[in-house]
């Protein structure tokens, strides 16, 4: 007989972006804006990063990038370390706390 248990894991993350990383984000956003304005195809993730930058400013774009990075890191961690037949992971929910 198999035993199935469900767990919910929750923790807070505080991140401080240094000036160099902030400048790299601004350069990427500017590049995306130029590419989008020229009619080039950009990935859906980059498109959303640009939308966040235009609607919520650099802080919104940074928050979006961090949320996506955390989701990807959690997913990759479980893909690398777990037996997929034993463990199932739902999509990680990452939200900004004000």
Curated annotation (Swiss-Prot):
Write the protein's name: Gene 5.5 protein
Q: Which gene encodes it?
A: 5.5
In its UniProt entry, the species of origin is given as Enterobacteria phage T3
């Amino acid at each position: 007989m198999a035993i199935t248990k469900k767990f919910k894991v929750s923790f807070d993350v505080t991140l401080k972006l240094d000036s160099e990383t902030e400048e790299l984000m601004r350069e990427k956003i500017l590049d995306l804006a130029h590419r989008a304005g020229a009619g080039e195809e950009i990935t859906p993730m980059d498109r959303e990063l640009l939308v966040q930058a235009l609607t919520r400013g650099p802080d919104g774009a940074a928050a979006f990038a961090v949320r996506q990075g955390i989701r990807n890191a959690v997913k990759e961690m479980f893909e690398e370390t777990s037996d997929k037949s034993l463990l199932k992971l739902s999509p990680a929910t990452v939200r900004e706390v004000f």
